[in-house]
């Protein structure tokens, strides 16, 4: 039934925002800086629909997003559809679709709007825009370093100083080597990495209990290694993941980056990461949060599309 005398409210849907001209001007400026920097590094822009099939996210996206935060529905053809919660599976799908036609290494970027049904809070709404920068077809440590240097250039372009933020870096491959050294079963690696990523966000006792539930007595030794300054590198210095990450760090330090910090508790939440992971973290106590984040995902295209 249509019609009636009920007046409509002027508020936007909960968790999203309107952009009046003065606010749109600010967003446009931010986007223009992003574009100027990434294009100076040789990245080409792409885009895709906000609609994707549900199965694209089921296997590799963070379980919390899939189980609790997706905007999903069935269309009139009875297909399960989502509003994209992240862009990486989408760009992986696009590259897989024309893999033999795309010159490698391929440098692509996009500024997508993304949707997650989560509790709206400061700095986190149900719709947000982010800069996605991806390089395909390179196994060089320089590729890992390049993305971090690019993010660092963006911060400088906005006027940030080195002490305004720190660049935290780790490696999922290095952490997997650590789990193997501690004889933690391989099938536990993903859940352990998710728990470790929460270490600085939950009480110490809660963190310990979560680890003990998964790995028993190995939890105490794992915590001691994570808490020591160089414990992970000292234990695994001769391994391939440690040597690779050291090469990435060396490239970054030679590029005059001053605020790099090895952070073994940084693992990032997505299951598709296989190597280096990083975050640019705001050091201002009033805005203590990640600004940029990402990492290497070597197997995503093959895992999803064969």
Regions found by a protein language model. Name each.
Residues 1-24:
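Auxiliary tRNA-acceptor-end handling modules of aminoacyl-tRNA synthetases
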Residues 2-4, 24-41, 52-53, 77, ...:
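Positively charged, Gly/Ser-enriched RNA/tRNA-binding surfaces
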Residues 10, 57-61, 273-275:
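Short secondary-structure transition/capping segments
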Residues 44-50:
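A short beta-strand-loop structural module common to alpha/beta enzyme folds
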Residues 50-81:
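Polyanion/phosphate-binding surface patch
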Residues 66-77, 183-207:
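Acidic, His- and aromatic-enriched active-site or binding-groove loops in soluble protein domains
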Residues 166-177:
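Glycine-rich, mobile lid/loop segments that gate access to catalytic sites or pores
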Residues 176-186, 272-278:
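Short glycine/threonine-rich loop-to-helix capping motif typified by GTGT followed
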